Amino acid sequence: MNLNIVEYPDKKLREKSKEVKSFDSKLHELLDSMYPIMMNTNGIGLAAIQVAFPLRALILNIPDEDGEQPDENLIEMINPVLSNYSGEIVYQEGCLSVPKFYEDVKRYSNITVNYQDRDANTITLEAEGLFAIAIQHEMDHLDGLLFIDKLSYSRRKKFEKEYKRMQKDKKNG
């Protein structure tokens, strides 16, 4: 499957993803195709909508203490739902769909998420810190939200200005 990352301001990123009902070879092929894209772009998470598939599916591979992302750390979440959350944490986030822009975002520091794996098994997972942040970031994509939507008015204006400048620079080579 030949996939490309959808970049802001593409309207596809604003689509609300649909619940996955068929846990079949098409879903498996999509998940298998997403992983190398995420890893080759130095990502830690990727939602299906970011490769133009509006399905409630995402993948994560959080770096370990040594900064490594071994394949066995891959987590695939289908139809994830937050069931519990607490605390706050501010972290500088970036996004494969909003390249070269990073900004502080406030999120829950501890979460519990219920989801299904690629074989429709139900799983409950507790996460904290960067892992919790990444899950929330990717889950936002499933609802058509980007991390820049969480910025204050002034920070959002700063982003829009920087984004326009970057686009202009890109055109002028």
Over which residues does each language-model region extend?
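Positively charged
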Residues: 1-173
